[in-house]
Structure formats: C-alpha cells, structure tokens
UniProtKB/Swiss-Prot annotation:
Organism in which the protein naturally occurs: Rhizobium rhizogenes (strain K84 / ATCC BAA-868)
EC class name: hydrolase
Region (Disordered): 190-225
Task performed by this protein: Hydrolyzes ribosome-free peptidyl-tRNAs (with 1 or more amino acids incorporated), which drop off the ribosome during protein synthesis, or as a result of ribosome stalling.
The protein's name: Peptidyl-tRNA hydrolase
rRNA-binding as UniProt keyword: no
EC number: 3.1.1.29
Signal peptide positions on this chain: none
Residues reported in the UniProt entry to bind tRNA: Y14, F64, N66, N112
Protein family per UniProt: Belongs to the PTH family.
Alphabetic keyword roster: Cytoplasm, Hydrolase, RNA-binding, tRNA-binding
Extent of Basic residues compositional bias: 203-212
C-alpha cells in the first residue's frame, strides 16, 4: 500500500490558502480516479483506491498543519507501513510558483507540517514540494502562506493538478523523474535531463590520438620523423 498525504489546514476558512495546496493536489487525484468517498479515520479524511494496480490511501490530516505527523503516524502504524510507503505533498516557499520538486528524505526547511511528520514517521519518505513563491521578506511569510491564491494563479494551478492527477500512477511505480517531466511540460517548463555519464578514461592515449580518423596517412615506420611522431602520439615500437 502507498499513502499519499496532502498537507493543509481543515475548514472553509483555509480552503483556498496557498498553505493548502497539498489538500488541493490530493483532491485532484481523488477526482480523477475511482477512489472511495471521503471518510473520517486517523484524525483525517481518507479515501481508498488503486493506482497502477496498487492499493493507495489518500489522506488529508484534520489536525491542523503543525500536528500532521500525529495523524499520518497513526495511519502508518495501523497498516504497518514504512517511510518508503509514504508520499507527502505540500507547499514550498523556496520554490517559485508553478515549479515542483520530488525527492526522498531531506530536512523540513522550516515547514511545520513536515517537521511533525519527520518526528512521527521518520525522514526517508518521498516529498513532493509544490512551489508557492516567497513574498520577499520574512515578515510577510505568514500572510503569504495563509493568503488565498489569486485568480491569475489558476493559469498554472489547473495544469499542475491535471498533470499530477493524470500521471499519479507514476508515484506508485517510483517513476519520479518521469512525473517531474510531465509536470514541467504541462507548465511550459524545461524537462529534467538525465545526469550525463562520466567519460571513460583511456589509459596512455593522447586526446590528439583519439581524435584522428582512420583515413589519415600512416606514420613513417623509421627515421627522425617517425621518432618524433611516436613521442607525440604515444606509439610504441613492436
């Protein structure tokens, strides 16, 4: 079983807040796939379904953000799950709006919901961070995260949620980089390039020698010129 947790604060007052983008993302997955109606358990709203042939439990903790780990930890203990069975979706101040990042483990970055989950569930779970941008100064952070998205934000929120919901089965299969590419394409950004493989080192060969093609004339076999070319290209006598 995979637990997909969206973080946010319960209640209509917070429904449209930037801090609730995790709830919104999980709602999008719920709408797109054949999940059960929301029910109350583990001090959360939960819904069961399948993605990619695997059982999935969607969770929206109702404990308020700072105590999210209590709810998620309760669910993990009930189902006897490990941190590797957990994906948490939440807002990220340090990412620009319309950007997303997915990784395993790491710090809480000052996010109280993640701090709580780290304390109750361990740290080696997957974290899907959805950028909401930074207001620029620390004094404005609280009003920013607890403020509602603007109408103009729909231009990137809708394609973000659509891409996540359409490709949610990639979370189950562990296809993290592919999912990030799908989201980046939906948002008009660049896809993530695979890391280049390190070049193999060739022992005792000059880069000049490696660049030569096979149509070049053969080196002379003897004489002063032959000796000089042997030293340049590393050719040894038979």
């Amino acid at each position: 079983m995979l637990l997909i947790v969206g973080l946010g604060n319960p209640g209509a007052k917070y429904q449209g807040n930037r801090h609730n983008i995790g709830f919104m993302a999980v709602d999008a997955i719920h709408r797109r796939h054949s999940f059960s109606p929301w029910a109350k358990k583990f001090r959360a709203e939960i819904s069961e379904g399948e993605l990619g042939g695997q059982k999935v439990l969607l969770i929206k903790p109702q404990t308020f953000m700072n105590l999210s780990g209590e709810s998620v930890g309760e669910a993990m203990r009930f189902y006897k799950l490990e941190p590797s069975d957990l994906v948490v979706i939440y807002d990220e101040l340090d990412l620009p709006a319309a950007k997303a990042r997915l990784k395993t483990g790491g710090g809480h970055g000052g996010h109280n919901g993640i701090k709580s989950i780290d304390a109750h569930c361990g740290r080696e779970y997957r974290r899907l961070r959805l950028g909401i941008g930074h207001p620029g100064v620390k004094e404005l952070v609280q009003n920013h995260v607890l403020g509602d998205f603007a109408k103009v934000d729909r231009d990137w929120l809708e394609p973000l949620f659509d891409a996540l919901a359409d490709n949610a089965d990639m979370l189950v299969r562990g296809e993290d980089s592919q999912l990030m590419n799908k989201i980046a394409l939906a948002l008009g950004g660049k896809t993530e390039e695979p890391a280049p493989k390190p070049e193999k080192k060739t022992v005792a060969k000059s880069h000049i020698h490696q660049a030569r093609n096979h149509n070049q004339p053969r080196m002379p076999e003897s004489g002063p010129m032959a000796e000089m070319l042997k030293r340049m290209f590393g050719k040894k006598d038979d």
